[in-house]
């Protein structure tokens, strides 16, 4: 579906924000992944785990603001700080343009986009009970959907990273 839209040129007309994700830059020998292909992989991963249409929209749009937030900072490399929050702000404009519903379904997509990195961030730091409680409180009834999205977003080929994610993410959340 999405691949055909891309090769036909229609994706540029329908969702130019996705096309902006395409490409890899290199600065001082450091590159970042091609976020367009990463996004397609996330959508495919999620489709295997859920038939929730609105969660699939969240997967499609979860990195939509990365081109606007991309910076190279020495010595850390590429960062996309705040892409989740800016992406969440972009969702209503995209939904209105595509004449998608702007009701609770859109609000769910906004919430998932804005929270999409939160569970993974817990893996990168010492997990405290209060951090887990905040995540659960903020996610509310959507915690299972959020975890499915985060699992789908784990496209790394690094097996050590995958094991770390699973050991933290699924031990009681």
Q: What spans do the regions from the language model cover?
A:
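Core structural elements
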Residues: 9-13, 116
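Active-site pocket-lining segments that scaffold enzyme catalytic pockets across diverse folds
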Residues: 2
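C-terminal subdomains that position terminal phosphate/3'-OH groups for nucleotidyl transfer/ligation
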Residues: 20-21, 35-173
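Residue-level signal for inorganic ion chemistry
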Residues: 5
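Acidic catalytic cores of enzymes that act on phosphate-bearing nucleotides/polynucleotides
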Residues: 12-19, 24
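Short catalytic-site patches enriched in acidic/histidine residues
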Residues: 26-27, 43
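Glycine-rich tight-turn/loop motif centered on a GG-T
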Residues: 28-33
